[in-house]
Amino acid sequence: MQESRDIGSPRTASVGIRLLVLLATLLGLAVAPVHATARGAAAPFKVLALYNGTWDAAHINFVHEANEWFPQQAAQNGFTYTASDNWNLLADGGVDEYKVVLFLDDLPQTSAQRAGFERYMRGGGAWMGFHVAAFTTEAQSWPWYHNEFLGTGNFKSNTWGPTTATLKVEDRTHPSTKALPATFTSSVSEWYSWSNDLRQNPDIKILASVDPSSFPLGTDPNQTWYSGYYPILWTNSEYKMLYANFGHNAMDYDTNTPLSSTFASETQNRFLLDGLKWLGGAGGTQSPAAPTSASARTAMSQK
């Protein structure tokens, strides 16, 4: 009988309560880091890639590559990837839900698309463009994009055929290039030059250019660069943007067979991923607000 009374005694109950409290505390310590990690995990940012995909086999092949490569990188790098050939998403506000917009092989063609893109960028959107996204021989038809945003003006020349280039990293403090070596070998591409000297534009920060050790650059003597200064990667400090000169694979045009891959350079891929993370908000800064141009306001009012 005495044993039965001891089990229910205040002293025994007190010990039991203390044990329960200790157990609860230990369980709380074990679970807390999991909840803290879950609360601290950033939601993936959304990326929209716009493409044309209908002209020049090399550009089409790049689009196919990009639409395979970026989704493969998405989960481990904190973003989601959607590809579309509907450029009217720029005109009707369909891009507003995306943190970053990519132009893979073209640029907006209608006034509504152009006005929508300008509004998106001035409103804090982010952009990465490749190769032909800067191509034009009529910069005056969209001066905000070609002269202010990109700073390039008109297309001036290109190399041919597509080759690798040794690139000199000019700014190793920018989030997109801080992990890159002083020089690196690019993937194969055709390379463009433009009428405007980007070095003279105070808003343009050139991140990488053709290293002189690359010359001569090209395989056709009539379309080879033998000397000069050629920007390859840059940003505009007035916007959250990055432009990359590459995006044109070597091709066997007789059989439409690719002879190279834009994503063959691991160092170049590092730029793409670090740049995309910066654009998506990892360590970046807010885009400066800027007034919309008169042409954009007119186009938007006509929607």
Region roles according to the model:
Residues 1-15:
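N-terminal secretory signal peptides that target proteins for export/translocation
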Residues 18-30:
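Bacterial N-terminal signal peptides
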Residues 33-39:
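Sec/Tat signal peptide C-region and signal peptidase I cleavage site
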